[in-house]
Amino acid sequence: MQNFEIIIGVENHVELKTNSKMFSPSKVSYGEVPNTLANEIDLAYPGTLPSVNKKAVELAVLACNALNMQIDTLLTFDRKNYFYPDLTKGFQITQQFNPIGRNGSLEIALENGNKKVIEIERLHIEEDTAKQVHKDNLTYLDYNRSGVGLIEIVTKPVLRNAEEACLYVEKLREILLFLNVSDVKMNEGSLRTDLNISLRPYGSDKFSNKVEIKNLNSISNIKKAVEFEINRQKEILLKNQIVEQQTRRYDDQTSSTILMRSKIDSIDYRYFREPNIFPIQLEKSWIKNVISNSPELADQKRIRYVNELGLTSEDANIILTSLEMTNFFEKTIKLTSNYNKVAKMLISEIQAKLNLENKTIDQIKLSPENLASVINLIDKNIISSKQTKVIMPIILDSNTETVEQIVERLNLKLITNKNEISKLLVNIINQNKELLEQYPTRPERVIKTIMGQLMKQTNGNVDPEIANQIVIKSIEQNL
């Protein structure tokens, strides 16, 4: 069977994390009542004029810097002209001729341990279109999304398989999330992925027609779409047929790509400069200031967690899978020096609760202060690790009491006073005289039994190390 070289390019549309839209003051909020967040500018009323959202430009600069791009200091916009119901003006404001970012790169770590640099062609700013909802042979339009700020990030056609495409989008998502450029929720459409896929026989310098797959909304769907489309195109080429230039979509139910439309000729969008937005000169000092305030990226945190805080790579990676968990961890380690204990508790019992309730850590009652208090009390030998089974369910669901108040109310403090422990042992020793006779031959069994009775009598509130020493001493004194 003939082997083919796979050529993949990735385009990502990323909704910017701004309070207002790209060219209007309308509020940006997901899940609101349809058509309640669109003003005269968004709906293209005659006489309305756009104004550039400064915050959106800042976020675009941050993204360009993180992706090692050349940042253009002259900000200009263009009109992309076409008619479609989701585009009220009859054109989209974008950056065709002069994107804010060019010639970037992003390194990904492959599963075989090798690394690959993905070349990025451009990053440009534009506005989103209205959302289309298809139902019962009708199409509804929600203009709440119309005009929301976007950045589009386009790679060069340098990816070669589904693994690379998935790893690239995952890494891009992580960077944009930790930069606070976007919430990158693929299921909500704030990170949308388009793929351009073509095949050619190895050794050929001619590309076959590319097929575009639109609006992939999960990493798993990216993988499935790439694998299906590669096989589909292979079958066509092996029959000596021509792959038609098409736009397709991925269908979850059939696990296949479905034809949306064929592309016989490329569409002429009649691009020209946006006359209502004058060119804006971005001062180099302003760009430098924006970059200097860039949040710490996940890769930087990963190095710090392992090298400075002593976490394992595995624990660091689990913490960093969620921005909410990472922020919680950062706040907690400011209140305690037992960084490993914080990580272990977050990724075990706390994560188990989050998984059970399908929540993020900022959606439950647990506070960094209370988690740090539990760890500090254990480290100071005021409570035992066993007592966390009593305390944690309370502080996970309520923040009305401090941990110290809970410990006091439930009498959970460890008994560490030797005289007090000795007094508690008197009755236990007296009730187990026959057992003590076995001590010379079976010392471990005797100690374990006496310790068990002591723990039962005190509800486990005795320091085990101190108690063990006193138990041995008391037994030997009563032989």
Curated annotation (Swiss-Prot):
Annotated Pfam families: GatB_N, GatB_Yqey
First-level EC class: ligase
UniProt cross-references to SMART domains, sorted A to Z: GatB_Yqey
Molecular-function annotations in GO: asparaginyl-tRNA synthase (glutamine-hydrolyzing) activity; ATP binding; glutaminyl-tRNA synthase (glutamine-hydrolyzing) activity
Signal peptide range: none
EC number per UniProt: 6.3.5.-
HAMAP family: GatB (MF_00121)
Family: Belongs to the GatB/GatE family. GatB subfamily.
Protein name according to UniProt: Aspartyl/glutamyl-tRNA(Asn/Gln) amidotransferase subunit B
Origin species: Mycoplasma capricolum subsp. capricolum (strain California kid / ATCC 27343 / NCTC 10154)
